[in-house]
């Protein structure tokens, strides 16, 4: 009887062994992949604040990339003979970048304003420690870029606690 039960168990397990899925792996030949890259003329503008840009909101990065990729030489107002500057405003959903381009199409300086953006984690945690029990209500971000200086970030945050509100600028 023991041999009979042992035989049934082994026979039952053999069906389970063959029911496993086969694994397949597809690999691509690295030599066949081509990567198209183009150098952005205003790469310094996008990368100038590399420590801060890691924590910037996605929509800030997107609008900055649009401003960096903009080619002033394709516009009808562009003059090849004069060394002048061009003021260009980029707007999207209440956010804007006022950029000043030089004759070569490089951004000399810019003023940026963004409403209701995600606040960087470092600043959020510091404010939570400084103002316990307060909630974040609104936030705005201003960025001032200059080719000669480091970018300056200013966050204006409205904190609320019941009927009270505080305006914090950092």
Task: Pin down the residues of each PLM region.
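Exposed beta-strand-loop-beta-strand "reactive/processing" segments of non-cytosolic proteins
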Residues: 58-99, 144, 148-167
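Sec-dependent signal peptide cleavage junction
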Residues: 16-78
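Short coil turn/linker residues within repeat-based beta-strand modules
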Residues: 40-44, 103-106, 163-164
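Bacterial Sec-dependent N-terminal signal peptides
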Residues: 1-25
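Short, solvent-exposed loop/turn and secondary-structure capping segments
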Residues: 102, 169-170
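Long, charged/polar, surface-exposed segments that mediate recognition or autoinhibition
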Residues: 99-137
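Gly/Ser-centered flexible loop/linker motifs
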Residues: 134-138, 143-147
């Amino acid at each position: 009887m023991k041999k009979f039960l042992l035989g049934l168990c082994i026979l039952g397990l053999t069906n389970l062994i063959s029911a496993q899925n086969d694994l397949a792996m597809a690999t691509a030949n690295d030599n066949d992949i081509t990567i198209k890259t183009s150098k952005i003329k205003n790469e310094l503008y996008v990368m100038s604040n590399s420590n801060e840009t890691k924590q910037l909101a996605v929509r800030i990065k997107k609008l900055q990339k649009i401003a960096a990729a903009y080619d002033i030489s394709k516009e009808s107002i562009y003059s090849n003979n004069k060394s002048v500057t061009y003021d260009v405003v980029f707007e999207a959903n209440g956010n804007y970048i006022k950029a000043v381009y030089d004759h070569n199409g490089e951004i000399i300086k810019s003023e940026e304003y963004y409403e209701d953006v995600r606040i960087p984690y470092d600043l959020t945690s510091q404010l939570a420690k400084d103002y316990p029990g307060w909630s974040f209500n609104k936030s705005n971000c201003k960025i001032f870029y200059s080719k000669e200086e480091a970018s300056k970030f200013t966050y204006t945050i409205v904190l609320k606690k019941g009927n009270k509100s505080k305006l914090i600028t950092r």
